[in-house]
Amino acid sequence: MGQSQSGGHGPGGGKKDDKDKKKKYEPPVPTRVGKKKKKTKGPDAASKPPLVTPHTQCRLKLLKLERIKDYLLMEEEFIRNQEQMKPLEEKQEEERSKVDDLRGTPMSVGTLEEIIDDNHAIVSTSVGSEHYVSILSFVDKDLLEPGCSVLLNHKVHAVIGVLMDDTDPLVTVMKLEKAPQETYADIGGLDNQIQEIKESVELPLTHPEYYEEMGIKPPKGVILYGPPGTGKTLLAKAVANQTSATFLRVVGSELIQKYLGDGPKLVRELFRVAEEHGPSIVFIDEIDAIGTKRYDSNSGGEREIQRTMLELLNQLDGFDSRGDVKVIMATNRIETLDPALIRPGRIDRKIEFPLPDEKTKKRIFQIHTSRMTLADDVTLDELIMAKDDLSGADIKAICTEAGLMALRERRMKVTNEDFKKSKENFLYKKTEGTPEGLYL
């Protein structure tokens, strides 16, 4: 029995055990999630660019950029259309402003009336209006003083600069740069008048110590009066030629200005320039244009003329001493002048210029005929001895007319007959030939 059981586990039972050993448990293969990963094929596959699939994202980006480009083109076209739709006036104004910015804007000139503080002032323009304006920060405040000329912005009138040379151009023109050619030798007669004007004007400028030793003050000014053509202006020219002083010549009518206050301002400028360039002589011809007697007037122009004369009175005899400034006035209507203008202290000497006498007439004829070619029969005694009221200018006109008569007949010498005819023609035109009031 025992052998039979053990025999049951013999060679047949060993085969079944081998089969059991081969059928061991193995876990299931895990399920793959996602795409199947491709196997790389070494370093060659790593160097190649990856394939992008699909192409949908790149195309969407391209379409988006194209749409943005279309929007930008539409905006550019819209702006261009808006520019073209602008009014022509606005476009021209914009272009004009650009040109002004490129070449600079003009500046107006005004007068500083009063300084309020460091940044504000009151200025006046040429039309007479006053403005409260600001002073820009770059303006030199040390140069600002009341009465100086300043540069103003043409829009807001702000002070943007200071004019260093604030001399009025009208006063600059009055100053004689070249001395006249006339001398005392060209004046016939008038010896007393020449002596008086030398004592009053020329000697105080050249030798003021003489008056200091005498203990007297030299005259401030003189007035030359007399009929027209007697040599008043000629004597003033001779004084300008004889002295080396600055000579300022002005006609009374030039001191009458259009705008209110310009006349007195011009008088102040005239004497200020004369004092700066001293010693100097101020010659005011035809002073009766502004120096007439004052009266109550309703006219604004007449009141302005009177204010100009009052400023002249102040300059002649004010608190400030004139120093080396001498004044010469000339008029042929001294009776119409205001007494305050020609009183002692302002005009200390009055020099009269009468019509020439026989001796003076002879001297004047000799001066005007010295350069003329005269015939042998010329005798001027008849012309000199005549009782006609001839002035120095009349004698010069007679000599000139005689020379023209000789030229008319193609002669190079002036005869005595030419002088007679020229005198007759001149006197006829002076007295009877020209109706009174023809040229008024």
Curated annotation (Swiss-Prot):
Its keywords, alphabetically, are: ATP-binding, Cytoplasm, Nucleotide-binding, Nucleus, Proteasome
* Compositional bias (Gly residues): 1-13
One Gene Ontology CC term in the entry = cytoplasm
> Where is this chain's protein located in or outside the cell?
Cytoplasm; Nucleus
Please name the GO terms of the biological process aspect recorded for this protein, alphabetically: proteasome-mediated ubiquitin-dependent protein catabolic process
Segments of skewed composition (Basic and acidic residues) = 14-26, 86-103
- Which GO molecular function entries does the Swiss-Prot or TrEMBL record give? ATP binding; ATP hydrolysis activity; proteasome-activating activity
Query: Would the keyword Chloroplast be found if you checked this record's keyword annotation?
Result: no
User: Which SUPFAM superfamilies would you find in this protein's record?
Assistant: P-loop containing nucleoside triphosphate hydrolases
This protein's superkingdom?
Eukaryota
Entry-linked InterPro entries: 26S_Proteasome_ATPase, AAA+_ATPase, AAA_lid_3, ATPase_AAA_core, ATPase_AAA_CS, NA-bd_OB-fold, P-loop_NTPase, Prot_ATP_ID_OB_2nd
Family the entry assigns: Belongs to the AAA ATPase family.
PANTHER family named in the record: 26S PROTEASOME REGULATORY SUBUNIT (PTHR23073)
Q: What is this protein called?
A: 26S proteasome regulatory subunit 4
Q: Which organism is it from?
A: Gallus gallus (Chicken)
Lineage of origin: Eukaryota, Metazoa, Chordata, Craniata, Vertebrata
